[in-house]
Regions:
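Extracytoplasmic ligand-binding site segments that recognize negatively charged/polar headgroups
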Residues: 48-61, 73-85, 95-257, 263
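Early extracytoplasmic/lumenal segment of secretory-pathway proteins
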Residues: 4-109
Length: 397
């Protein structure tokens, strides 16, 4: 229907095949905290939040103190549950959720969920003026996180031993691998696979980074005829995927155990691991000798953004938006609501909020915004390539 098509303000329009990107501003975007609070008191005063981060629980008390008369209820769910519960509520017309927290790392949520009439975008204009436009493209962000390569600081007292992604899989003169590699199974971890997909989309940069690292052109050794879909020829990102899939790796599902493996490694038997940046917490909590590898060429990581939405059909439309503003810092970036999300390995995306927790600021990481549409287009193929090539790896049998 015509009306439905033009109602979509963010996401993939099934009728026209068009993508609509943020930020999208409407009347709500202009309203202040005070205006929203006043309005919130006249509607259903219980605000239900479907959160994917248990840290959201820590906001209940301070929010209710700041805004007397409003009652905040937080449900701690996983990402798929947030979406599936919201869908059931929408389909039955029995809408409980008011605010939804989602995370999209491969474009699936943007392309397949935004257009189901379940999520309503909300971009508060004053706050968005402090956020990079590329971080508003796929939703309104709560904070950024990412995966990082960790190294052992005792084994490498002079600093990180690698400066490019190619060096991670480097071989010694005798053909053996330079580093022991610990990671989650890439093919089952959509955030990691998306990162590898981005290298295929940015193949020119991968080729250049190889040349910068080794002073010669990359040789292509993968066989594009392995698949019944079109694999690009002479693509440095595909070459990287192929070489990485043939490396010797140890898959560990738990992030704390991944960084422990690096902590236990030595200068003679050096190790690297790919884990979520927040695992750096083990350095202070458990005394691990670990640090992040920063500014890897061509880029360190993709920024994965936690996004906030209003549930379509909510009976607390003002209260829901007031809460979204509150946990993203409020008008001045000073609200208590942001505090639980400030930890090492989480980065605020506002330029007017001081980030004291992180050893490196967002601008210093060498990470980049995640282009979800480009990743979504090739993600299934990349998954097939990884899975098939990994199955052919003699070291991983």
């Amino acid at each position: 229907s015509e009306a439905a098509a033009s109602d979509l303000h963010l996401g993939y329009d099934l009728n026209t095949g068009e993508n609509y990107y943020g930020p999208y501003y409407d009347d709500w975007s202009e309203k202040t905290d005070d205006e929203l609070y006043e309005e919130a008191l006249t509607e259903d005063t219980t605000i239900n939040v479907y959160a994917t981060s248990s840290k959201m629980m820590k906001v209940e008390e301070s929010f209710e103190e700041t805004y007397p008369g409003l009652d905040l209820v937080v449900f701690d769910l996983d990402n798929d549950e947030v979406l599936s519960k919201a869908k059931i509520e929408h389909d039955t017309g029995n809408i409980t959720a008011d605010v939804l927290q989602t995370k999209d790392v491969n474009g699936n949520v943007f392309h397949e969920w935004y257009n189901q009439d379940i999520l309503e975008p909300y971009f508060p204009k004053d706050i968005c003026s402090h956020i990079d436009e590329e971080n508003l493209k796929y939703g309104y962000p709560l904070y950024a996180s990412q995966s990082m390569w960790f190294y052992n600081t005792a084994a490498f007292p002079d600093g990180q031993p690698i400066h490019s992604w190619w060096e991670i899989i480097e071989k010694k003169d005798d053909g053996t691998q330079k580093y022991h590699l610990f990671t989650k199974e890439i093919g089952q971890e959509s955030a990691y696979l998306s990162l590898f997909a981005s290298f295929i989309n940015n193949a020119d940069e991968m080729a250049q980074s190889y040349k910068d690292t080794y002073g010669k052109d990359l040789e292509y050794t993968y066989d594009a005829s392995d698949f019944n879909f079109e694999v690009p020829e002479k693509n440095a990102g595909v070459e990287y995927l192929w070489r990485f899939s043939q490396a010797e790796m140890t898959f560990i599902g738990d992030g704390d155990e991944l960084v422990l493996a690096v902590h236990n490694s030595t200068a003679d038997e050096p190790a690297l691991c790919l884990a979520s940046a927040g695992k750096i917490g083990n350095r202070d909590e458990s005394g691990y000798n670990i640090a992040w590898c920063l500014n890897l060429e061509p880029y360190t990581a993709l920024l994965n953004l936690e996004s906030l939405f209003i549930a379509k059909g909510t009976n607390s439309p003002a209260g829901a938006r007031l809460f979204v503003r509150y946990i993203t810092g409020g008008a001045d970036g000073q609200s208590e609501g942001m505090k639980p999300f400030k930890k090492e390995g989480n980065w605020p995306v506002r330029d007017d909020v001081e980030d004291k927790k992180n050893p490196a600021q967002l601008s210093e990481l060498g990470a980049r915004a995640n282009d979800l549409s480009a990743i979504y287009a090739i993600y299934p193929d990349v998954q097939d390539m990884w899975t098939y090539w990994l199955s052919k790896n003699p070291k991983m049998k």
